[in-house]
Amino acid sequence: MDPLGARSQFVEVLNLPTWDQPQGVQDELDGENHYEEEEEEEEDNLTNQLNSVNSPFTFRQDINNKIVLFNGDVALLNCTAIVNTSNETLTDKNPISDSIHRHAGPELRDELLKLKGCRTGEAKMTEGFDLAARFIIHTVGPKYKAKYRTAAESSLYSCYRNVLQLAKEHAMVSVGFCVISTVKRAYPVEDATHIALRTVRRFLENHGENIETLVFAVSDVEEPVYRKLLPLYYPRSKQEERISLPLLPADIGNSEGEPVVPERQIRIAEKPVNLEDDPEDDSLDSDLGLVGSHAFARMEGDVDKQRKLILQGQMSEVAQQKQHQRNYNRWLCKARAEDLSDIAALKALYQTGVDLCGRTVMVVVGRNIPVMLIDMEKALLYFIHVMDHITVKEYVMVYFHTLTGEHNHLDTDFLKKLYDIVDAKFKKNLRAFYFVHPTFRSKVSTWFFTTFSVSGLKDKVHHIENLQQLFTCVLPEQIDIPPFVLEYDSRVNSPYYSAQSAGL
């Protein structure tokens, strides 16, 4: 108890400003977060395009009115429950836990012993004891390793989701969240913030009718990140909603905010074609036709005509570059607004570790691309969405051609269109393209394609006959290889490996 007349150290959440209150909506988005066109006409075109695309996170004043960003100690919040981040034995020593224990008193430690631990991603509840909060919800965030990024994302989502589920089950009115992903667990702050904000947003949309106040308690280090990303998921006006749309990440999760995990999403149907929304999309030609017929794609302009104008001297190189950049920005904007979870579920394109030079490794699994059964425009959008932030620095690509069939082979026209659309950084920063387990036919096709269609790629393509050859460029622990590729390589190349061993 505080001495009579003394000022309480605890903070009443009802007195804190909510996110919907005007604070200069544009402040957090100035500078780096905007598309800055040099000409006013170009800005108008992009604005008109943004106006025609709906954001997956619309302006909702009722939700914004529940959100509070608080720079301070979560242990001091006077609300129904606060969140404590700990380890699996609930004995972690970190600034958040230490403060909660200090203010709650020794009874909390005794109570935690009775819980017998908590697994990563789970949440358990105790009394608040000497805290102003009535309850403490304890959860365990994941340890982050780039190689197991998907697992870490799913675990962190589970932390937030399970905390919110407990709050719902106990009809809690207000909840104070700490930053669950501690520095000790090495989770990138910005990545973790995306998961936190979108999970809470989706929960409030779908199940948050009883929650009146939800506080994000942050430190000086985390506050700028939260202020930067909050407008993406909690826009405070229609204008901010439009401005934030192109800034959303590739993976915005499903309807609950959960990261899309391919192993859980892929389902084998007896007649997969029947699952398509459009029964006419049964050929590669019709898929490619969608790219040009879509209203969004039509803004792109005729690439061949642009080349012709350049050859005729009617369009300067600078003007052509600006036109290309505008076209790419439109595709990128569309990619960020589209639901691409069905393409992500194929796990045909994903990021893994780094090569021997420290460059990011992107993997393409040819066998996982059912060309005849998917919307190729969405496949193109997914490639742009995933690769856009990767290509800002040097990277390499590993393509597994292993056990692919005719139904997995991308049409040359589609590949050429992809090459023409992508930003210059895609081509400039690609240092190597490793073509693993090529066939004679694929080698010939690749030679023709890189010689006559995209000559700038020719010197970067390297045919890799076996995984041992690949491992001279990328260490085994730095690349996630599909099991069927490992099995195939072991079966087909075992005589080669045996001969190598015998020669040593």
UniProtKB/Swiss-Prot annotation:
This is Ganglioside-induced differentiation-associated protein 2. InterPro entries: CRAL-TRIO_dom (IPR001251), CRAL-TRIO_dom_sf (IPR036865), Macro_dom (IPR002589), Macro_dom-like (IPR043472), Macro_GDAP2 (IPR035793). PANTHER family: GANGLIOSIDE INDUCED DIFFERENTIATION ASSOCIATED PROTEIN 2-RELATED (PTHR11106), GANGLIOSIDE-INDUCED DIFFERENTIATION-ASSOCIATED PROTEIN 2 (PTHR11106:SF72). The lineage of its organism: Eukaryota, Metazoa, Chordata, Craniata, Vertebrata. Residues 20-46 are annotated as: Disordered. Residues 27-45 have a biased composition (Acidic residues). It comes from Danio rerio (Zebrafish). It comes from the Eukaryota. Disulfide bonds: none annotated. Residues 54-234 form the Macro domain. Residues 342-490 form the CRAL-TRIO domain. SMART domains: A1pp, SEC14. Belongs to the GDAP2 family.
